[in-house]
Each structure stands twice: as C-alpha cells, then as structure tokens.
Design a protein with these regions (language model features):
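Glycine/serine-rich anion-binding loops at beta->alpha junctions
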Residues: 44-64
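Phosphate-handling active-site elements
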Residues: 29-40, 65-82
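Short alpha-helical scaffolding segments that buttress acidic/His motifs in well-ordered protein cores
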Residues: 8, 22, 26, 40-45, ...
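Polybasic, low-complexity association/targeting segments
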Residues: 1-12
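Short glycine/serine- and small hydrophobic-enriched flexible loop segments
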Residues: 24-28, 63-70, 124, 128
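Mg2+-dependent prenyl diphosphate-binding active-site environment of isoprenoid biosynthetic enzymes
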Residues: 21, 58-67, 116-117
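Acidic-glycine-rich active-site phosphate/pyrophosphate-binding loop
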Residues: 25-43, 93-99
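C-terminal binding/interaction regions
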Residues: 80-136
Length: 136
C-alpha cells in the first residue's frame, strides 16, 4: 500500500484530483495509459467542476469499480456499487455528508488533512470489493 500512496502523491503533485488519481491507479494496474480518460475524469474534480458536490473519491471509486466489472452481471455490479456507496456514506458520516463541501467543512486545509487518506481508503475498499468477487 505504501507504493500506492507514493503513486497517489506523485499524481497529486501533477495536479490530479481524487477521481483522476483513482482512475489512473486502475490504468496502472493494467499497464495502460489513457490521458483522454484521465482528462474526462477531471470533470468530477472537487465535487463535479469544483462545485463542492459529490466527492471525487466517491465518484472515482465508483468508476474504478465499474472499470474492473467486465464480465459481471449488471445486477451484481450494481450491488457492488451500492455496497461501496453505503460504505462511503458511513465513512464520511463524521463530516455530515459525502460531498466535497461537507468533507472539507469550509476549511481548504482539510483537503491536505483528509483527502489523501480518504482516497487511500477508497482504493483499499475497491480492491477488497473486487477481490471478494474474484476480480482482483
């Protein structure tokens, strides 16, 4: 996991945000590179276009799971995504919600204090969910 965290920091220094980092990690796992996809994931940055909406770790995690869901029945995939969302909702309850605004609680320094650990936890949860289904 230390290598993953190091890679997350490297991507963050390049200007990537949560959803982009998670999708790049998915691509890395397959030895792929797709700058167009990473650019598209930028639409999810900071709660969709920096609006403070749904956290990019949540939306990026959902995209990460869907990326690796090839071969799953749609209902099985949706069940996995719901399980992930339920976990994320519980994980972020201490902040009062799952939006970027709630997680940051109006303090921009919370981005440094909270987001890296949250993205790392999301990555671990996604790996766990995929592993449970024989996909990782």
């Amino acid at each position: 996991m230390d290598d993953v965290f190091g890679r997350m920091l490297e991507l963050s220094r390049k200007g990537y945000f949560c959803a982009q980092i998670l999708m790049q990690l998915a691509l890395d796992a397959e030895g792929k590179d797709c700058p167009e996809l990473i650019r598209a994931m930028g639409g999810l940055n900071a709660g969709i276009g920096f609006s403070g909406g749904p956290c990019g770790a949540l939306t990026g995690g959902a995209c990460f799971l869907a990326y690796f869901s090839e071969g799953m029945e749609p209902q099985e995939r949706d069940t996995m995504l719901k399980e992930f969302h339920d976990w994320f909702r519980e994980r972020t309850a201490e902040y009062g919600g799952e939006s970027c605004d709630r997680i940051l609680e109006g303090d921009p320094t919370n981005q440094l204090r909270r987001c890296p650990a949250l993205v790392q936890e999301v990555y671990a949860k996604c790996a766990e969910l995929l592993s449970e289904r024989g996909l990782a």
